[in-house]
Amino acid sequence: MNTPTIERAIKESHNARAAIVRGDASGYLALFSEADDVTLGNPFGPFGRGRKNVEERLALAASKYRDGRNASVGFIAQYVSESLACVAEVESAEAKVAGGAEMTKVSVRVTSVFRLEAGNWKLVHRHADPLQIPQ
């Protein structure tokens, strides 16, 4: 069996981040597990628990961003076992946020947990906190 690597799933999450700051949540929707134990915490509201709730939270987050660009990721740590992986990163981009007209630098601390499901690494938890002080 040719199992996709965790590195590929992480790259897909970086692509999803670049898309969501342009208002497009489809990358995260594809990457999140279909299982009902998924969770999402982001700066725009309380934690989402369960696939349907996570979909709603992703749509809300995407609606808060426009015209995103210059997405980048700073690696902090990665822990991988046979079926689970945890990644800590700092993600940055520029975007118009919450209806604002000006481009704003947005940096968040992110913890992502992936699970190997049917040969594919799927996102099961993502938590992003805004950085108040540049790292």
What do these predicted ranges mean?
Residues 1-31, 83, 135:
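Short, low-complexity N-terminal intrinsically disordered segments enriched in polar/charged residues
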Residues 107-134:
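Short beta-strand edge/turn micro-motifs at domain boundaries
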Residues 76, 93, 109-113:
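Hydrophobic alpha-helical segments of small multi-pass membrane proteins
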Residues 90-96:
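Generic short beta-strand segments
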Residues 99-101:
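Outer-membrane beta-barrel domain signature
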